[in-house]
Amino acid sequence: MCEICSIKTSWLPKVYESYEEVGTLLPELAKELGVSDQVKIVAGAGDNAAAAVGTGTVGDGACNISLGTSGTVFISSDKFGVDENNALHSFDHADGSYHLMGCMLSAASCNKWWMDDIIGTKDYGAEQENITKLGENHVFFLPYLMGERSPHNDPNARGTFIGLTMDTTRADMTQAVLEGVAFALRDSFEVARSLGIHIARTRICGGGAKSPLWKKIVANVLNIPVDIPENEQGPSMGGAMLAAVACGEYPTVRDAAETIVK
């Protein structure tokens, strides 16, 4: 690839594991911060990979859903798997195994758009209290407000409501938004399952996870238990855990996850 793109390999940086030390703090920064210049700088990870570590998503079939502005399904696997027909990412995992990751572009942002821009309210909880018929809604919502990435990978996909009638209520449409996001997350689950990965339960974090109703809808749609970690700040916790491994506090990322995450 470097040859095709006329990139010299000497231009490429050294690759580190996410839990490896890459240096120490610059003396001038250490002085400004009032700390030792021997403070280690650790490679770290991107937001979703760090969130997986911080939510204990290690071990075959372990899963975490990040229900934020976008929606991410992160699934750990002991074997490398690729689905050539769907847009799920396949990578190495920090604990030495592999992971699949599906990222939908609009998740909690769909709910924000519906509540803030269409209904015109900031009281999300009050709106959700009007939803009383889970499993009976005849209104459907496709959450493709910004196109889609996983698993459909179509920038031209667009959102829509389906099944509106004269009897449709505001609560029906609010429910449809929450359910539409949940079913879009399920699309990535189904791709992972088609590769032979067994997912028995999942953790969930992110702003959308603060809604008890939405968590219940996700659990119903996926038909598996949904757990809430004690510390819901997955990315920052994951970064701290990777640093702890680099400093020798834990021998491996998996040991850190199994010890710290509850």
Q: Across the structure, where does each feature detected by a protein language model lie?
A:
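Active-site core segments that coordinate phosphate-bearing ligands/cofactors
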Residues: 3-4, 27-262
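Short beta-strand to alpha-helix junction loop
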Residues: 18-22
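A short helix-to-beta-strand connector/capping loop
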Residues: 10-11, 37
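Glycine-rich phosphate-binding segment of PLP-dependent enzymes
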Residues: 2-10
